[in-house]
UniProtKB/Swiss-Prot annotation:
Domain of life (superkingdom): Eukaryota
GO molecular function: 4 iron, 4 sulfur cluster binding; iron-sulfur cluster binding; metal ion binding
Family classification: Belongs to the NARF family.
Gene: NAR1
Record protein name field: Cytosolic Fe-S cluster assembly factor NAR1
Pfam families cross-referenced by the UniProt entry: Fe_hyd_lg_C
Binding site for [4Fe-4S] cluster 2: 184, 239, 442, 446
Region (Disordered): 395-426
Keywords for this protein: 4Fe-4S, Iron, Iron-sulfur, Metal-binding
Biological function: Component of the cytosolic Fe/S protein assembly machinery. Required for maturation of extramitochondrial Fe/S proteins. May play a role in the transfer of pre-assembled Fe/S clusters to target apoproteins.
Organism: Meyerozyma guilliermondii (strain ATCC 6260 / CBS 566 / DSM 6381 / JCM 1539 / NBRC 10279 / NRRL Y-324) (Yeast)
CC terms in the record's Gene Ontology section: cytosol; membrane
Residues that coordinate or bind [4Fe-4S] cluster 1: 20, 72, 75, 78
Coiled coil: none
Gene Ontology biological process terms from the UniProt entry: iron-sulfur cluster assembly
């Protein structure tokens, strides 16, 4: 694997198969075959395959088989994506290539930057997030020639609102058991390929990356009076799996181009700067020459028709993965108070936190007058995800569950010790019994994504992540729950956007999932199942 992306960089990484099992698609060329007649394949002096007609000796170059990111999404040969595909189609080299071709194809370059990536870069360069924002705008706009740069805060808030509304609606219609978030593409791919029984539980709300991409391309195209496919959107994200998310096919093909053309991580951005020192740099001179407020800076690099500019660079309460579990409960509280103000008063609500078996799983409970109203859980890391999925697996009523005798004896021993000491059972988080679960594949969540910059060799990685988390927490917060009018404003603007720019709401806000069928060819199974 490359120096940028390796198994060591990805927590709980499950190695892909040793070879791709995707079958080669043979095109139907009956008319050409009748002209060529019988053919044979030969290799020329340059090692390239040729198709040679036995009738007249005419030759034709053969196209090599290619694997795309979309192919990876539709294949069950690997649980995670092939690294070569990620590097080939979403890499800093591809961005450099696209920038070089800008003069001939007149592409318009725009970028969006996630909160976690900003925090990671600020930690790596030992500066404040506000300063790294200034340097990133200078790099992208002044040095690379990008037309617009925005934060993903607006897309995230629309995602949070849509997610919460969706969960509330499904629960009010009697949905039983937990609804699972879909913001983490690594977790979603894992579910599609190995645990299809949970797909009906997964929310169909799009991530901030994809919502931001749809907004940015549509607004830019309208303002500059160009087609969407003339716009090249770079998204800077904390995770390599975000590259795969950008390649997911849309259910609604009305918008012709992908919402995101290239995803780079902070690691890859630093590599680009190292390899192109003569052209690009996060130059500290830009700070000394940067007068004016951050608000002015954010306004200057956003499309003129981009709403809530400062909001796009603001953060949200809750976890460093976006706060989906926390915001669901806060927005549910607001919903209950608005729906039935006689029964629910805001001052009588409180939020309780319950720890799990480890620091990567915990539960939040919304309590009203000592009665639990709803709950959400935060589950990070594949080990915790696997435990949750196992609990959610349907069991046949005709089969009896066998208890491991060792486990039974251990439970009895612990119970006996508690009885002898007079200690009470301590509550422990159980995500399988919550209303909603925020799931992220990486331990510690997105702040510790596989694409985030690692600690220097002389510094502890856990301490480094803690420093990154501190910088993430320094980003100004605008809570949806603290201002109910903001939520209503955003919902109204979203509806107007969809009408004015002819974008279906489902195209902007919704995604879809499907079971990836296992291969039936025995040779493919043999090759693709070696882990």
């Amino acid at each position: 694997m490359s120096a940028l992306l390796s198994a060591d960089d990805l927590n709980d990484f499950i190695s892909p198969g040793i070879a791709c099992i995707k079958p080669t698609v043979t095109e139907n060329r009956s008319q050409e075959a009748s002209e060529y007649g019988e053919v044979e394949i030969q290799i020329d002096e340059n090692g390239k395959p040729l198709e040679i007609s036995k009738i007249d000796g005419a030759t034709k170059n053969l196209s090599p088989a290619q694997i795309s990111l979309a192919d990876c999404l539709a294949c069950s040969g690997c649980i995670t994506s092939a690294e070569e595909i990620l590097v080939a189609q979403h890499s800093h080299n591809e961005l450099i290539k696209a920038l070089k071709e800008k003069k001939t194809n007149n592409k318009i370059f725009v970028a969006s930057i996630s909160h976690q990536a900003r925090a990671s870069l600020a930690t790596a360069y030992y500066m404040k997030v506000s300063d790294i924002d200034r340097l990133l705008v200078d790099l992208l706009v002044n040095q690379m020639g990008f037309t617009y740069v925005v934060g993903t805060g607006l897309g995230r808030k629309l995602s949070l609102i849509n997610e919460s509304q969706s969960v509330i609606e499904r629960k009010e219609h009697g949905f039983q058991g937990p609804i699972l978030s879909s913001i983490c593409p690594g977790w979603v791919l894992y579910a599609e390929k190995t645990h299809p029984h949970v797909l009906s539980r997964i929310s169909d709300t799009k991530s901030p990356q994809q919502i931001t991409g749809c907004l940015l391309k549509s607004l830019t195209a309208h303002q500059l009076e160009v087609e969407r496919d003339q716009i090249y959107h770079l998204s800077i994200m904390p995770c390599f799996d975000k590259k795969l998310e950008s390649a997911r096919p849309e259910q609604d093909p009305s918008l012709v181009s992908n919402d995101v053309d290239c995803v780079l991580t902070p690691k890859e951005l630093v590599t680009l700067l190292d390899e192109c020192k003569d052209k690009f740099s996060l130059t500290f001179d830009a700070l000394s020459h940067s007068s004016g407020s951050l608000t002015d800076l954010y306004q200057s690099c956003a499309p003129a028709n981009w709403p809530y500019v400062e909001l796009s660079w603001s953060s949200d309460s809750g976890s460093s993965s976006g706060g989906y579990g926390y915001n669901y409960l806060q927005l549910l509280q607001s919903h209950l108070c608005l729906r039935d103000p006689q029964q629910y008063q805001p001052q009588n609500f409180r939020l309780e936190s319950v720890a799990g078996r480890n620091k990567d799983i915990y539960e939040l409970r919304l309590v009203y007058n000592d009665n639990q109203v709803a709950s959400s859980a935060i589950v990070n890391g594949f080990r915790n995800i696997q435990n949750l999925v196992r609990k959610l697996k349907p069991t046949s009523s005709t089969t009896t569950t066998k208890t491991n005798p060792l486990v039974a004896r251990r439970k009895a021993r612990l119970s006996s010790k508690r009885s002898e000491s007079g200690a009470q059972d301590v509550q422990q988080a159980d995500a399988s019994k919550c209303d909603y679960v925020e799931i992220m594949a990486c331990p510690n969540g997105c702040i510790n994504g596989g694409g985030q910059i690692n600690s220097p060799t002389d510094e502890d990685q856990k301490l480094w992540v803690s420093k990154t988390l501190t910088r993430y927490g320094s980003i100004p917060m605008v809570d949806l729950s603290s201002d109910s009018s903001l939520t209503l404003e955003l919902m109204a603007w979203c509806r107007e956007f969809c009408i004015n720019y002819n974008v279906p709401e489902s195209r902007l806000l919704k995604t879809w999932f499907h079971e990836v069928e296992q291969p039936t060819d025995q040779a493919a199974i043999l090759v693709g199942s070696k882990w």
